[in-house]
């Protein structure tokens, strides 16, 4: 997650600080890693991953950091929620943040080293972009009169692409929207689709035009002071044409997968109908051992309940 500045608390959410943190830090050639307690081993792991990630990011963007980046590592998500680096309340779904005011990266360790590695890499993409486009701090951004706003799908999509390249979750999501012809335009890549849709878009750009175009897009944004004009200068097309090219790419990739498949409605029976019941969620299904019953979470009553549905094979 990238935050442009330290916003006020989210409405109705109190940021309660239960303890004081006695911070220590270690340094690498490009980063200051802050930690507390007995977690120096975690800080050293963070330092190694950060420098490895930075080499990859720097190569793709053709940019060397001009300013050191501070990284603050919390021991748990509960303690991460107490951070005063940003004023925004850190909900459970936020795995890390990078703020522009001083270009600081903040994240918790949740016990999963592979996910932790991904979060470090993801957030450092934001930090390097901040340094490249905005000068690394809000003060430098004002001094240089940089007005360009990097779209969320551009920023988060690139962070996902450089930290994961391509993954099964992204493949599943893009396959689904391509098969069902619900591919959004680039301007419609909001919320969760800013991450996975943006990741797919950067995969398309890097695959068709070469990875050197990644950094060129951002240099062009800074030069033109416009996100769309930056894409146009670097790729030779406006966003409408970029959307069309990306849509064709996805259809070419995924449509052959369904050419020889039977339609789902011809080979199965639908047990839930959210349109008929006027609800939003029918999720987390679990089949009974004999296959006669399905338990799932549903909000058909207006609240989340565990519902039991009997399959067509039930006695």
Question: Language-model features: where?
Answer:
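Residue-level detector of Asp-centered blade-edge/turn motifs that repeat once per structural unit
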Residues: 289-290
């Amino acid at each position: 997650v990238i935050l442009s500045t330290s916003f006020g608390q989210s409405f109705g959410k109190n940021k309660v600080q239960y303890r004081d943190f006695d911070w220590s830090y270690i340094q690498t050639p490009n980063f200051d890693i802050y930690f507390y307690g007995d977690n120096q081993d975690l800080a050293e792991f963070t330092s190694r991953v950060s420098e490895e990630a930075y080499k990859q990011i720097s190569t793709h963007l053709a940019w060397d950091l001009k300013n050191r980046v501070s990284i603050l590592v919390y021991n748990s998500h509960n303690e991460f929620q107490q951070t005063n680096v940003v004023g925004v309340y850190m909900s459970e779904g936020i795995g890390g943040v990078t703020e522009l005011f001083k270009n600081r990266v903040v994240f918790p360790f949740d016990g999963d080293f592979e996910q932790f590695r991904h979060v470090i890499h993801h957030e450092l993409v934001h930090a390097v972009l901040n340094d490249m486009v905005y000068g690394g701090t809000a003060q430098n951004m004002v001094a240089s009169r940089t007005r360009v706003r990097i779209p969320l799908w551009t920023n988060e999509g690139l962070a996902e692409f450089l930290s994961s390249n391509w993954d099964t979750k992204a493949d599943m999501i893009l396959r689904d929207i391509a098969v069902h012809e619900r591919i959004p335009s680039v301007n419609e890549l909001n919320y969760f689709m800013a991450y996975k849709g943006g990741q797919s878009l950067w995969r398309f750009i890097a695959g068709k035009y070469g990875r050197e175009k990644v950094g060129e897009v951002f240099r062009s944004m800074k030069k033109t002071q416009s996100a769309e004009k930056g894409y146009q200068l670097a790729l030779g097309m406006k966003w409408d044409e970029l959307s069309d090219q990306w849509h064709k790419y996805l259809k070419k990739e995924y449509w052959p997968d369904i050419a020889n498949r039977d339609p789902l409605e011809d080979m199965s029976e639908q047990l839930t109908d959210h349109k008929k019941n006027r609800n939003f969620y029918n999720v987390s299904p679990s089949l009974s051992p004999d296959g006669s019953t399905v338990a799932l979470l549903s909000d058909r009553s207006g609240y989340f309940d565990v519902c039991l549905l009997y399959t067509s094979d039930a006695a």
